[in-house]
């Protein structure tokens, strides 16, 4: 089931990026991220482990000029274990260069995942406690994805980013349980067009 959902998400994500004929693929990105969570004010390793991510970023189509010319992306994220969360989706990235070779890049998107939505066991049972201890309970099959990245360029075609991503339904896509997912990691970028980031 997880493999089918993940494969379907990948196809939808790639198709949505390829459909606009006037946009072209500008960047290919590879990332490694770790799941983190807040444990009573302390940031600790999350329940969902680590993921590898691939992202395609296209040029900004003209119809997005009115919101600052963000660039559309499609991405997939595969967990390194059998028990973690896989996800994929689409979104928009804004990029601002604030110093020579340095840029800040926020993003907003939409993902579909194969993680746990709720606890299948009755409340206040040992099984429910054990399940909650091992899984983030996300409440909705689809989630919003927000990202913040700090980028350093290495020449005209390569760059690296330290970034944070948060995913949750925000009580908009669904109601009720909303533990969300948080990841931090590093990604490397290859630009097919050296002028793509300008």
Map each language-model feature to its residues.
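Short loop/turn motifs that connect adjacent beta-strands in outer-membrane beta-barrel proteins
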Residues: 20-25, 59-70, 97-104, 157, ...
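Transmembrane beta-strand segments that form the barrel wall of outer-membrane beta-barrel proteins
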Residues: 26-42, 69-80, 167
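Transmembrane beta-strands of outer-membrane beta-barrel proteins
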Residues: 26-30, 68-74, 88, 102-108, ...
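Outer-membrane beta-barrel translocator/channel fold
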Residues: 32-37, 105-147, 151
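Extracellular loop and loop/strand-boundary signature of outer-membrane beta-barrel proteins
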Residues: 42, 75-79, 132-136, 171-176
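Residues that define the transmembrane beta-barrel architecture of outer-membrane proteins
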Residues: 46-52, 84-88, 142-146, 180-184
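Residues on the lipid-exposed face of transmembrane beta-strands in outer-membrane beta-barrel proteins
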Residues: 52-58, 90-96, 108-110, 148-152, ...
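Outer-membrane beta-barrel "beta-signal"
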Residues: 180-198
